[in-house]
Every structure is written in structure tokens, then in C-alpha cells.
Amino acid sequence: MTAISSWSELFEKRKKIKTLYPEIWDISLIKKEMDLLRRLIRDGIRILEIGAGDRRYEDRIKKIAPMVIYKSLDIDRETRQDYYDIDDIHETFDFIFMFEVIEHLTKEEAMVMLKKINSLLNQGGTLLLSTPNLYHPNRYYQDITHKTPFRYEDLGAIMLMAGFDSIKFHRMYNDDFFRRMFRIAIGIYFHKYMEVDFARTILAEGKRI
């Protein structure tokens, strides 16, 4: 049974996202995830990282806000985590982030995951996630374990359907200073003409309503 119960609702939510961001170029450009984490994290909040791997973000986060409570989830039991199954979590968080995970799920699994994440957030809590930018020519296809390509409008739509609000998107691109400036100031016209983006990653944030 599909977790997406209404395809007409999905299409309507997609239109809502496209109204906010008509084209990929309407999405703001940032250098790296930490630019957003610095803005979203503050001392004293409870944080869950999903797909934590080696927990490398724990130290980075605690340099920003030493008093945060950080918990991690990953299905790889060869790594050290607080949780290995999201259904084992019986506490709530102010901020949950999930980088390069959702594309490894089917669209139905992604909807179930987003609804579960929404239930783990305190009211007003924030989810931040990333996924390969489909407007980049080859970013998504560089990993054989990817299951679902998410355009930003589709990702935003299922986030809305899962109970999130105030959806915002960011494109992420970092490079050598001169190459980055060339791409942003001059190369952008070529990229727009070809309808391909140089930003490799899309980040989405949403709040629990």
C-alpha cells in the first residue's frame, strides 16, 4: 500500500513549491551545510542526525553550540550510534538533519520516513535534509545505491504532505575561489541556457506545524 494516498494532493503541493521557486535558479546558493547549521543550531536544543555514519557532524556542531544534546541514528551496526532503528526512538527533538539519505529510499519509504521525523520533532522544530541536485548533469547517477531521484518541487511536495511547513530550499556549491566566482558571475548564463546547474546538492528545510 502506497504511503502517498493522494496523487492529486501531491500535484497541488508541487504547484505550491513551484510558485515559491519557479526555476532552480530562484533557489539561493550557499557554500556548504555548515552555513545553515550555524544559523539553525543554538545551545540547549536537542538534535538528531539520521544517517550519521561516523558522526563527524557531532564535533562540528558542538563547536558552534557546546551545550546541545546530540543523538545519532544509522542502520550500520558496525558504527557507534545511539539508535539503529528509527522506530526505537521514543524521545523528541528540536532539530533533525539528514544528509544524502532520502534518495536511498523509494518514494513511499521517503513519505513514511518524513512522517516519522515529523512526529519526532517538537512543535516548531526544524528538519534539514539534502539530496543530489537533479539539475546537475551527473550528481545523482554517481551512486548505484540511489533509488529515487527527487526534484526540489517533488521533495517539497512530500514534505508538505508529511506535515511540514515553511519549506525553504538552498543550492550548495563550493569550489576554488576563482572557479566559483567565474561560475556564479559568468558561467551562469551558459548553465541557464543549457538548463543544467553547477550546484551539486539541494538542501531543504521545513518546520513542524
Spans of model-derived segments:
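C-terminal alpha-helical "lid/dimerization" subdomain adjacent to the S-adenosyl-L-methionine
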Residues: T145, L160-M161, S166-F177
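Conserved beta-strand signature within the Rossmann-like core of class I S-adenosyl-L-methionine
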Residues: G124-T131
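A short acidic, helix-capping loop that chelates divalent metal ions and anchors anionic groups
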Residues: T79-Q81, H136-Y141
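A short His-aromatic
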Residues: H104-L105, T148
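Acceptor-substrate binding/catalytic loop of class I
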Residues: R139-I158
